[in-house]
């Protein structure tokens, strides 16, 4: 009963919002739809430009400041009399965050953009094992000896015992909860 009451009130609210549009709202939407995407216009405009470096003048192009490691620099203006001078600067909070974080390392991509499946050989790609149920599989290597006595490594993507225990406990808990509530 509560469920149907909630959705009926929600439906009426959405219906009211749809029917309460005025002609001005519709004109604004038509204007927005008639122009090309705002983002693509900005990208087309800025493709040919080079950015303005930090501590250089940006009076003529206030949105052309370069990007730091993480954040974009801002054009800060100072007015003296009738003239106004603007310089690309970095905000203090951005400077503190960038100095604390440093360079953001790019995550290494797998060789063929696919992960190594469970129990497959991962000797060459030890960090690219696929994700299991909740956790990512880990590459585990074992020492093997041939008939000649030569040592070789046998590597495979496996799930550690702790991860198996946690996933098993969650499966059992989910089943118990489902059985209790009749699902």
Swiss-Prot record:
Motif Processing quadruplet motif at which residues?
44-47
Stretches for region Predicted alpha-helix: 164-177
Q: Which domain of life is it from?
A: Eukaryota
Q: What's one Pfam family here?
A: Toxin_35
Tryptophan amide modification sites?
Answer: 181
Signal sequence residues: 1-20
Residue pairs linked by disulfide bridges in the UniProt entry: 51-66, 58-75, 65-88, 77-86, 115-130, 122-139, 129-157, 141-155
The record places propeptide residues at: 21-47
Q: Keyword set for this entry? A: Amidation, Cytolysis, Disulfide bond, Knottin, Membrane, Neurotoxin, Secreted, Signal, Target cell membrane, Target membrane, Toxin, Transmembrane
Q: How is it modified after translation?
A: Cleavage of the propeptide depends on the processing quadruplet motif (XXXR, with at least one of X being E).
What InterPro entries does the database record attribute to this sequence?
Spider_toxin_CSTX_knottin, Spider_toxin_CSTX_Knottin_CS
What role does this protein play?
Spider venom toxin that exhibits cytolytic activity by forming an alpha-helix across the membrane. Lethal to insect larvae. Causes instant paralysis and death in the larvae of the flesh fly (S.carnaria) at doses of 20 ug/g, at doses of less than 10 ug/g causes reversible paralysis. Has cytolytic activity against insect Sf9 cells. Causes stable and irreversible depolarization of fly muscle fibers, leading to contracture at higher toxin concentrations. Destabilizes membranes.
Name of the molecule in the record: DELTA-miturgitoxin-Cp1c
Question: Organism source for this protein?
Answer: Cheiracanthium punctorium (Yellow sac spider)
